[in-house]
Amino acid sequence: MMDKETAKHRAEELRRTIDQYSYEYYTLDEPSVPDSEYDRLMQELIAIEEEHPELRTPDSPTQRVGGAVLESFQKVQHGTPMLSLGNAFNDDDLRDFDRRVRQAVGDGVAYNVELKIDGLAVSLRYEDGYFVRGATRGDGTTGEDITENLKTIRNIPLKMKRNLSIEVRGEAYMPKQSFEALNEERLKHEEEPFANPRNAAAGSLRQLDPKIAAKRNLDIFVYSIAELDEMGVETQSQGLDFLDELGFKTNQERKKCATIDEVIEMIEELQAKRADLPYEIDGIVIKVDSLDQQEELGYTAKSPRWAIAYKFPAEEVVTKLLDIELNVGRTGVITPTAVLEPVKVAGTTVSRASLHNEDLIKEKDIRILDKVVVKKAGDIIPEVVNVLIEQRTGEEKEFNMPTGCPECESELVRIEGEVALRCINPECPAQIREGLIHFVSRNAMNIDGLGERVITQLFREHLVRNVADLYKLTKEQVIRLERMGEKSTDNLISSIQKSKENSLERLLFGLGIRFIGSKAAKTLAMHFESLENLKQVTEEELLAVDEIGEKMADAVITYFRKEEMLELLNELEELGVNTLYKGPKKVKAEDSDSYFAGKTIVLTGKLEELSRNEAKAQIEALGGKLTGSVSKKTDLLIAGEAAGSKLTKAQELNIEVWNEAQLLGELKK
C-alpha cells in the first residue's frame, strides 16, 4: 500500500501519461502503444483513487471520456452520450461487477453477453425510417460527420423497415480477409500497410473521398438504440432482436445468461472461437439485460454501471531498448520514454513506451541496449515489464537523468515529496509550447485548425509567446506558415476570433491552472460567474463551493495572485476575449416557484416536442430532480409514447402521471 504522498505523485504521472496516449489513440488514430498498457495504467490509477478518494480530480481520465474531434469533418453532437465501458481482466473482476449490480437492484439479474468488435464505434441517425446522419464516437459527446462514408457500407440500411426516428449505435469494422487484401494492394503500390484491421477501418471512414471507403469492403454490427426504452422494448436481448427486425445486422454470437457463472462459461466458449472468427474482437461485453435495471443502476461520468468489458489476457514479446528520450510537459515534469526496436505485438507495431520517472528506471535496472519484455493486453499502450538481465552482453549503458532541462538547460529540481523531476523555468520553451497546445484544445478554447503542428511553427517563428499573442495574429503572418493556404488561413483566423465568444469555463480550463480540469472549471465559472470575481476570491469562498477541495483552492489563489498572470488576463480582456459565464445557472428548489421544484421526477417513453436531454435540462433548471427508476420516493412520472413498465409501476404505486402536453404547459409558465 502506498503512502498518501507517493500515491499523489504516482496518480499525477498516470493522468499525464494516459491523457497523452488517449490523444494519440482517439485523435490521431496513431496509437503508439497497445491497449494492454493503457488498461494497466488506467487500472492502476483507478486503484489509487479508490484507496485515496481525496486524490480523485475532476479532470482525471477515470472521470471522463477520453478523445477529441479532428478538423477534417463537421462536428456532430450526440443526442445521448456514447460512453466507454469499465474493464474486467479476470473472473474475480466479473464477480465483483456482479456483486455490485445485485447489491443495487437485487438478485433477479440476467446478463446479455456479446462480442466486443474491434473497430470504430459509430452512431447512425434515422428520421422517419431514413438514414440521415452517421457520426464517429469522438469524445463521447461530439463526433465527426462521416455520413457519406457510412453509406458505402452495404449492411447499413438507407431505409429501415419501419418509419421510426431513432439513433442506432454500432461498430464499423474491416473483416480479416478484406484487411489482408487491402494490405497486399498497398504493398504492391509501395504504400505503408495498416498495422491492424481497426486502424484500417478508422482510416477508411475518415477519408474525405467516399469512393475510397467504398473500395475497402467495410462491415458493421449494430448493438443498441439510444432510445431503446421508448420502443416498447424491455431488455437488451429483445432490443437486439428488434434491430434484426428493422433490417440491421447484429452479431449472432450472443447469449442471455441467468448467472455470472453462466457468463464466465460463455466467455470461455467465445474466447475459444476467437481465432476462427472472420473479424477481430478485443473482448467480450457483459450487459445487465433489463432496461429498467439499467436505468436504476445508472452511470458514472465515464461509463454505465450496468455493463463491463472483459479484456483478453496480455501478450508479451521481447525487443531491444535503443535509447531513452526525455519530454518536458506543460507543468515542467520531465518524462522519460523508451525508444524500442520496432516489434509487432498483437497486430500493432510498438516502438515507444513511457518509463514514467527516474525511480522506475532504477527500480527495474533498465539500461540502454537492454533486451526487454514488452507487454500488451489489447491494442493501446505498451509497458516495459522487465529486463532480461541474463541476456546482457556488456555493451549496455546505465541511464542517468540529466541535471539540466533538455529544452532550456535550466536546473532540474525535485519538489519535496514528488517523484518527478521538474523544470521550474517559466520561460522554458517546451512548457510554453505545451501550454499553448492545451489552451487551443478541444475542451479548452476549441480553436479549429490550430493543432500541435501549427502551434509549433508559430512558436518557432516567434509569432506567439503566450496565449494572448494568438489573438494578435494576422492573415499575413499565418499564410506564410508551411501547408497554410488562403482558405485554411481564413478558417483559422475566423476560428480564433470565434473563440473569443466562449463561456468562461473554457478560458479557465485553457489557462492550465494546476488541479483545475474541465469539470472544476465549469463549477468555478458557474458559481463565480466572472473572471473579475475569481481574481478577488478568497480561500474560504472557494472551499464553500461543492467539489472544490483544498488543493484546488490553493492553486486558484496562487494563480490569481501572480502579477504576470493578472497582466496576461487583462491583456486577453483588452483583446476581446469573453470573461463571463454564459451557461445555465443551477437553481435550488427553494429558489424556484415551479411545480417541479423539489420533486423527484421520472421521464419515460418517447417525447415528440423535446428530446429526453432537453426535457431533463429544463426540469432541473426549475429545481426538479430526475431519476431513472420509479419507486415510492417518486413524486411524478412524465410518460411519452410507448411508456412501458415504468408507467405500470407508477400506476400501481398511485404516483401522479403527466403526459407530454402537461409537461410543456408547465415549462411554458
Swiss-Prot record:
The protein's matches in InterPro entries, at most eight in alphabetical order, are given as: BRCT_dom, BRCT_dom_sf, DisA/LigA_HHH, DNA_ligase, DNA_ligase_AS, DNA_ligase_CS, DNAligase_adenylation, DNAligase_N
Q: Which reaction does it catalyse?
A: NAD(+) + (deoxyribonucleotide)n-3'-hydroxyl + 5'-phospho-(deoxyribonucleotide)m = (deoxyribonucleotide)n+m + AMP + beta-nicotinamide D-nucleotide
- Major enzyme class: ligase
SMART domains, from UniProt? Answer: BRCT, HhH1, LIGANc
User: Any idea which positions bind Zn(2+)?
Assistant: C405, C408, C423, C428
Q: What is its EC number?
A: 6.5.1.2
- Please state what the protein is called: DNA ligase
